[in-house]
Amino acid sequence: MKSLSILGSTGSIGLSTLDVVRQHPDRFTITGLAEGHDVTLLAEQIREFKPSIVSVRDEASANQLRELIGESGPEIRWGIEGAAVVGEADGSDMVVSAIVGAAGLVPTVRAIKAGKDIALANKETLVVAGQLVSELVREHKVQLLPVDSEHSAIFQSLSGHRTEDIERIILTASGGPFRKTPAEELKLVKPEQALKHPQWSMGAKITIDSATLMNKGLEVIEAHWLFNMPAEKIGVVVHPQSIIHSMVEYIDGCVMAQLGAPDMRAPIAYALSWPERCESGIKKLDLTQIGTLTFEEPDMKRFPALRLAFDALREGRTYPAVLNAANEIAVAAFLNNNIGFTDIPAIVDKTMQAHEALTPVDLDEYLAVDRWARETAAALTL
């Protein structure tokens, strides 16, 4: 029996994780839950999964939750500190890190320091502080297992192979809802249009990132840290059907790929049960029904966010943290109808240009850079 704490339990990844857990009561149990937006749903999760500790956004939400579940429920914490306490709490074997954005960094780092294995859905943890997190994973001898479908695919395709035999890794991208949209029309895109992803059901922020291709850019940086690959050995190909989740090309010319229906429960189930496998509940793949798989080069002129991410990776140091923070601010401004769709990468670019890179030595320095980038980007949205 493996005990789990889920950071981000009411979000898309959290709900999919609990669905996998629900299918395997003999394999998984829940120790802790943390959420940020839906106290009512968290109360339902508490009644079903009976965690011993939970966390919510703030003290007001904690009081609301206590009214919903009564005094006999679990210990309740709040804020980033509360999520971190859930992540490091005794009794859990693995922490599913699924808080959206850089807010997931501190709780994930605290969980690693507490010796917890990590199922990582929060790519920003590695984008912002990849060097630090990688060192902590080695120091505390924990497993860092990818939940993103692309990185799970690479992880599976690398199984049994030597790192020195890798020619390159290839991340696939759906291309988003505007894959064929002319550049001049992208300026007119509204949030409700960008939130309609052609293949995946995800939260608002990652759906916008997928539309700009920033999500793929963040995944490029995440892949660098997960698999110790330089930028020149990481490729991106647009694959609209989202059936091949990513590939590894080897020095002998052979390519290993992982295929499956576009359903996050598959990579989640693999991360939770690794090195074994368990039923995920997804629809089985029938290639005869799909018929055709197509591939294209990404258009970095129409979607400059992907180019900016590669630039940040090549520059290194604190540039990826600035890229991520500026993007979070710009996406929020777009969702609030304060800026246009094409303003998102423009604001990221301007924020990066204003940055003088540092070499952080601890988490506080990464967080200081994150704050600077948010303030700088926010000023550009006014």
Swiss-Prot record:
Enzyme Commission code: 1.1.1.267
Binding site for 1-deoxy-D-xylulose 5-phosphate: K123, S149, E150, S174, H197, S210, N215, K216, E219
Origin: domain of life: Bacteria
GO MF: 1-deoxy-D-xylulose-5-phosphate reductoisomerase activity; manganese ion binding; NADPH binding
Pathway membership, UniProt: Isoprenoid biosynthesis; isopentenyl diphosphate biosynthesis via DXP pathway; isopentenyl diphosphate from 1-deoxy-D-xylulose 5-phosphate: step 1/6
Metal-binding found in the keyword field: yes
InterPro entries in alphabetical order: DXP_reductoisomerase, DXP_reductoisomerase_C, DXP_reductoisomerase_N, DXPR_C, DXPR_C_sf, NAD(P)-bd_dom_sf
Keyword Metal-binding among record annotations: yes
Residues given in the record as Mn(2+) binding sites: D148, E150, E219
Endpoints of the signal sequence: none
Keyword tags: Isoprene biosynthesis, Manganese, Metal-binding, NADP, Oxidoreductase
Co-factor requirement: Mg(2+); Mn(2+)
EC top class named in words: oxidoreductase
Binding sites annotated in the UniProt record for NADPH: T10, G11, S12, I13, G36, N122, E124, G203
Catalytic activity: 2-C-methyl-D-erythritol 4-phosphate + NADP(+) = 1-deoxy-D-xylulose 5-phosphate + NADPH + H(+)
GO terms of biological process kind: isopentenyl diphosphate biosynthetic process, methylerythritol 4-phosphate pathway involved in terpenoid biosynthetic process
PANTHER family listed in its UniProt record: 1-DEOXY-D-XYLULOSE 5-PHOSPHATE REDUCTOISOMERASE, 1-DEOXY-D-XYLULOSE 5-PHOSPHATE REDUCTOISOMERASE, CHLOROPLASTIC
Biological function: Catalyzes the NADPH-dependent rearrangement and reduction of 1-deoxy-D-xylulose-5-phosphate (DXP) to 2-C-methyl-D-erythritol 4-phosphate (MEP).
Family, per entry: Belongs to the DXR family.
Protein name per Swiss-Prot or TrEMBL: 1-deoxy-D-xylulose 5-phosphate reductoisomerase
